[in-house]
Amino acid sequence: MELKNEFRVSVPVEQAWATLTDVEYIAPCMPGAQLTEIDGEEFKGQVKVKVGPITAQYKGVAKFKEKNESEHRVVLDASGRDTRGAGNAAAEVTAEMTADGDGTKIVITTELKVTGKVAQFGRGVMADVSEKLIGQFVESLEQKLLEPSSHVGESG
């Protein structure tokens, strides 16, 4: 199932790129996500998602499949198992960033595959959940980006 989300952040594309490719920095912005381990370009963690009446918690791994700085395009592969053994989830997430005046337009395309209880919900419900999560993520991300102590661009 393909989900598409579009949003804008009020920082230049270079800053948006530096931020969105810093998984450790942006993970806390994602509702229900928790980063537990970083091993080079591999990230382990868990995410809790409410879909309809079901709350699913997945434990898994994500890694960059593509990081093209000149095109400001990044592809992340993620997969996880429901911690209660009630299914799996896998996603290929592509983020494309383009300059938009003094800000950046970001288009996120997610190719999502889920099994288990969550899979009973159709594309409409999943798209609504995705839209809500991305909305909360963007709000949190904007606040972080606009903090004067923002570390974007630093390596550490």
Where are the regions a protein language model picked out?
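Hydrophobic ligand-binding cavity/cleft-lining segments
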Residues: 1-42, 46, 50-54, 156
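Intrinsic-disorder/low-complexity, polar/charged segments enriched in Ser/Thr/Lys/Arg/Asp/Glu/Gln
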Residues: 2-6, 42-44, 57-59, 73, ...
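Short acidic, gly/pro-rich beta-turn/loop elements at beta-sheet edges
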Residues: 15-17, 54-59, 72-74, 86-88, ...
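Glycine-rich portal/gate segments that line the openings of hydrophobic small-molecule binding cavities
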Residues: 38-80
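Hydrophobic pocket/interface hotspot
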Residues: 16-20, 26, 64, 108, ...
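Preference for bulky hydrophobic residues occupying beta-strand positions
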Residues: 5-7, 45-49, 76-78, 95, ...
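Beta-strand/loop substructures that line and gate deep hydrophobic ligand-binding cavities in soluble
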Residues: 61, 66, 80-128
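A conserved amphipathic terminal alpha-helix motif
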Residues: 117-153
